[in-house]
Amino acid sequence: MKKISVILTTYNSENQLEEVIDSINNQEGKGELFELELLVVDDCSTDNTKSILLNKRVDFQFTRENTGGPNHGRNLALKLCTGEYICIADHDDIWFPNKIKKLLAVSHLAQIVTSGYVLSDISSLNEVVRVSKSADKKGYLEYESNETFLSKLTKSKVGQQTYLGSILFHSSLKHILFEEKYGMIDFDWVLKLFYNQKSVEVCSALYLRKVDGSNLSLDENYRINDYYYSLKAISVYENEYSSQVKCAENRINGSMGRYYYLIGNMKLARKYLLKSTIEIKTILYLITTFVGSKFVKKYFKIFG
């Protein structure tokens, strides 16, 4: 019987933690198709998170001090886990009952398997299903070696769904660790994971990802850290994939420019947009940094 290690990091997670844990522990096929190992690492929560873990009889580790993000806890758990396959869960991800079973069903095809998901905005009550379509009735897509790596490297909006909560990967890749300088960025980890690897995507939504209006991606400090660390992450591949890295640089700058456009800092928006790919869309953004931005923000999606 295969063993699945599930890594869950927590910090002040009391609102949804019981539902998250139950969704993991109540997976179809548990004890029949696979054995489940749940590893929880808490980052010095100050709410009732630890009490909930104790009441649910969940063994957990905890960091000596708050590290400012989930990555240190993920690395601790990666070093402790003993499963043949590994999943990483966020404390606001609710797994559907068939998640592991469906991922395992195609795990013989590649060492990395992902799926689609449902994005639920708690503040607006809107839900968006993010699932790739299969051209046939197999219900999954196969990606050649480096196909997904290159789409992630170039910041392409098309290709395999690789949000962290969707990934099942073989334990032979557990040596790939997360950055701990900022403690919350996973772009470089995804690049390292998919480098020189084939992968498979199950064309179904297998979990619910809950977010709210105060999305971390809109925090300026997070954006600045993500910007510089993303540039550092892609530079590793410059000798091997120079044109793709240049494309990535342009898109990273474009994203930063649109972020500042969205929050109304037009001077910085122009600075980064001028470093991006100069195309009609970019020119229109640049022009409307002087006049017309309110109309653009009202009727068009700018960022995220």
Task: Indicate residue ranges for each PLM-predicted region.
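A conserved acidic beta->alpha catalytic loop
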Residues: 23, 42-51, 67, 90
